[in-house]
Structure formats: C-alpha cells, structure tokens
Regions:
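Short coil-to-beta transitions that initiate beta-strands within beta-rich domains
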Residues: 55-75, 110-120, 208
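A short beta-strand motif characteristic of beta-propeller blades
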Residues: 45-46, 55-58, 101-106, 147-152
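Non-catalytic accessory segments flanking enzyme active sites
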Residues: 1-2, 7-12, 17-26, 30-36, ...
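Hydrophobic beta-strand anchors of alpha/beta hydrolase catalytic cores
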Residues: 240-242
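Short loop/turn segments that connect beta-strands within beta-propeller blades
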Residues: 39-42, 96-100, 142-146, 187-189
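Short loop/turn segments immediately following the C-termini of beta-strands
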Residues: 25-27, 85, 90, 129-131, ...
Length: 243
C-alpha cells in the first residue's frame, strides 16, 4: 500500500513533560491515529487507530483533519482518554499506554457531545443526548465507578460553561418552542437555577406556540430518523403532510 499523507496535531503533554499525546489524521479523512511520543527515547507509539472508509468524524473526534479531537491523560499518566465512533455512536474510552487495555466509559444508543475532565481527575463533565437524539443534557461521570449523575436533563438543549473552581455553572437553555435564555446554578444534582435573561417579546409570549410530538421513522439504511410532528386542528385537517 502507498503511504498516506497525514497531518500532526499539537502535543498534549503529561505533567512530567516527558511524554505527549500526538493525534495524527490522514488528509483523505479516513484514518485517525492516537499516539504517545516519548521525548527521552524519541519514540512514537501507536495507542489507537480508527478507520472509516467513508469519513472519520463525529462529536469529540472532529470531521475535519486539521482539528484536534477530545483527548487527555488519566491515572497519573498511565492511561489516556479519547472518543471513538467504533460502535456507531461517539463514546468515551480510556486506554492504558503500557498494556493497551481499552475500557468503554460510556455505552448506549446516544452520543457524548462534549467531554471535560475535572480538576481532580476523577469526574468527567459530559454533554449527552441520552434521553433523545435532539436533547443535550449535562452530566457528571465518575470514570472509576462509571456512575453517571444527571445535572441538567430536562427536554431541550443545554450549553454549559463551568466556573474555574468547578463549583458553579452558567448555561444557555432552549426548548423546541422557546428561545435561548441564560441561567446559573451550582454544579451539583438538583441545584436550583437562577434565570438571568428574558429575551422574549410580549408578542412572542402572547402567541400560542405549538409543541410538536416526537417520532422516529426508518430511513433507507434502516436507521431510525428522529422527527417532529406538527398536527393541524381537526377542523382544518385534510390528511396531507409536509416533510
């Protein structure tokens, strides 16, 4: 086989500074290598190889070969964490750099949309579409126990920013028929949130916004496709539909 043209991403150094995670992407967007560079030995070791005949990409992976995926060190630099679509969904994994033992930290018919490791290196702060493909909920994951704790899980979309000390969060929240608003709360389960904005006009509030029902239908590839259904009133219904 002919060698592939590749691009190297910026190094992610461990605390000692003697090793670095290097992500390598093929320019045809079909291969991704996660490697460890040992600066003392000048050695580059393959940790994980991902291949997709169509296109490498997805949440935490990046569909563009010049953009780095979500990566980092774990367990006092004995392991790394990363995301992969090997199951068809983007999930979180850890892998030891010595024995190359891989462990799935998340599994299921949903995707990890965003992952951030906590300061203490024990918990991941995750954005998941766990309840529905269109939702974006916020969760804590203890990667050692694999206990997943919901923090923000109502139907809709949460965009979360964590304070530097990780005690508080600020987030935008919207639903199917309500626009984005800004909130703050403690970064813990069942915390009371404080709404900071009210962006809706009087005309918007006065309008009777329809709340669609949710459904899924099979696509040509036999994969479920999520959709919203807006049903007309019985008086105006003629059996027609618009997709």
């Amino acid at each position: 086989k002919n060698p592939k043209l590749v691009t190297y991403h910026k190094p992610i150094f461990n605390e000692k500074g003697d090793k670095a995670i290097i992500e390598i992407r093929s320019l045809d967007n079909k291969d991704r290598w996660i490697t460890i560079l040992d600066l003392k030995l000048g050695d580059l070791k393959e940790i994980d190889h991902q291949h997709d005949a169509a296109w490498i990409g997805g949440p935490g992976i990046s569909g563009w070969n010049q953009s780095q995926g979500a990566l980092g060190w774990l367990e006092n630099d004995k392991s790394i964490w990363y995301q992969s679509e090997e199951t068809g969904y983007s999930h979180l994994y850890k892998k030891s750099i010595s024995k190359l033992k891989k462990t799935a930290l998340t599994t299921g018919s949903y995707e990890v949309r965003n992952a951030q490791l906590s300061i203490d290196g024990i918990n991941f702060y995750l954005t998941l579409n766990k309840k529905h493909p269109g939702n974006r909920g916020f969760y804590h994951l203890n990667y050692k126990t694999k206990v997943l704790t919901p923090i923000l899980e109502n139907d809709g979309n949460y965009k979360v920013k964590i304070s530097p000390d990780e005690k508080d969060i600020a987030f935008l929240y919207s639903t199917m028929n309500q626009p984005w608003e800004l909130y703050t709360s403690k970064n813990k389960p069942n915390a009371k949130s404080l709404k900071l904005t009210n962006s809706k006009s009087e005309q918007f509030i006065a309008y009777n916004w329809r709340k669609p029902s949710l459904m899924q239908f099979k696509g040509n590839d036999n994969v479920n496709v999520p959709a919203r259904v807006y049903k007309p009133s019985k008086e105006g219904s003629n059996g027609a539909g618009i997709i």
